[in-house]
């Protein structure tokens, strides 16, 4: 049984799947199969999925929230939101909010700098889907810690952001990270030149000049996150984008209101 206390281990792989690299798996969801040269065996191409998801089989159904029992694999909950590690555990914010984690992508030729998935959870090629719920977050069960989840990879973030809006946000962040960390990017090359000609004083000066004078693209990231969180859409929905710096760029985290235990038909 997986719980929030095991968040740092939140990768779920079935025994029949072949793990090819972090964030991809070989399964029946593969786009196409290919034959290895060594053994002539068919191997599924990698399929991207959210490595932050886990499943939970011991829970109470939404329609009977006081009776906890084991469920079969087809009716296991998919844990798509987690405790808010950015809030103090004794705070009201911790009790009333959750965090949806967007994974990094390593399958698009971008291993040298952080890049996050621009697909809403549940839209990935390797996502777990439910026949009747579609691409909507539908609470199906409640765990012993009082949190509600659905049967699919679709997270509550879909209640607040459309795919288009979400993609715009992630694309903006990815572009900033590319400009910052790309080995042969303009910023890195210029930064090296200035460091050489100033005998190492450039980095010292750059830390002490304001945003308007700094050429560091990461300053743009701080400004973008701050402006996005202050936008009417985010304020009204009571959601927040956590600065990727705070997560060490391991995931792109969205703070959302804690999903409620609503009845489903």
Swiss-Prot record:
Gene name, Swiss-Prot/TrEMBL: ERF4
Identification of the protein by name: Ras modification protein ERF4
Record carries keyword Membrane: yes
First and last residue of the signal peptide: none
Membrane topology: Peripheral membrane protein
Compartments reported by the entry: Endoplasmic reticulum membrane
Pfam families: Erf4
Family: Belongs to the ERF4 family.
GO cellular component, one term: endoplasmic reticulum membrane
Function comment: The ERF2-ERF4 complex is a palmitoyltransferase specific for Ras proteins. Palmitoylates RAS2, which is required for its proper plasma membrane localization.
Top-level taxonomic group: Eukaryota
Keyword set includes Membrane: yes
Organism the protein comes from: Candida glabrata (strain ATCC 2001 / BCRC 20586 / JCM 3761 / NBRC 0622 / NRRL Y-65 / CBS 138) (Yeast)
Keywords, in A-Z order: Endoplasmic reticulum, Membrane
GO aspect biological process, one term: protein targeting to membrane
UniProt lineage: Eukaryota, Fungi, Dikarya, Ascomycota, Saccharomycotina
Subunit structure comment from the entry: Interacts with ERF2.
């Amino acid at each position: 049984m997986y719980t929030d206390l095991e968040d740092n281990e939140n990768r779920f792989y079935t025994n029949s799947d072949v793990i090819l690299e972090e964030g991809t798996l070989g399964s029946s969801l593969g786009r196409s199969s290919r034959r290895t040269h060594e053994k002539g065996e068919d191997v599924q191409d990698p399929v991207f999925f959210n490595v932050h998801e886990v499943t939970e089989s011991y829970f109470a159904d939404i329609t009977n929230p006081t009776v906890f029992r084991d469920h079969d694999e087809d009716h296991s909950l998919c844990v798509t939101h987690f405790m808010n590690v950015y809030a103090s555990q004794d705070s009201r914010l911790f009790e009333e909010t959750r965090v949806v984690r967007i994974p990094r992508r390593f399958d698009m030729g971008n291993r040298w700098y952080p890049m996050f998935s621009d697909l809403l959870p549940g839209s990935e090629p390797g996502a777990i889907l439910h026949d009747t719920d579609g691409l909507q977050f539908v609470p199906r069960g409640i765990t012993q810690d009082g949190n509600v989840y659905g049967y699919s990879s679709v997270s509550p973030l879909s209640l607040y952001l459309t795919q288009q809006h979400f993609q715009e946000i992630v694309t903006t962040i990815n572009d900033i990270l590319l400009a910052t960390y790309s080995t042969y990017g303009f910023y890195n090359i210029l930064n090296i030149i200035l460091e050489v000609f100033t005998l190492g004083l450039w980095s010292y000066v750059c830390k002490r000049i304001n945003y308007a004078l700094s050429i560091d693209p990461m300053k743009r990231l701080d400004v973008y996150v701050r402006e996005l969180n202050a936008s009417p859409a985010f304020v009204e929905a009571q959601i927040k984008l956590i600065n990727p710096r705070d997560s060490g760029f391991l995931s792109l985290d969205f703070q959302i209101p804690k999903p409620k235990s609503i009845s489903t038909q």
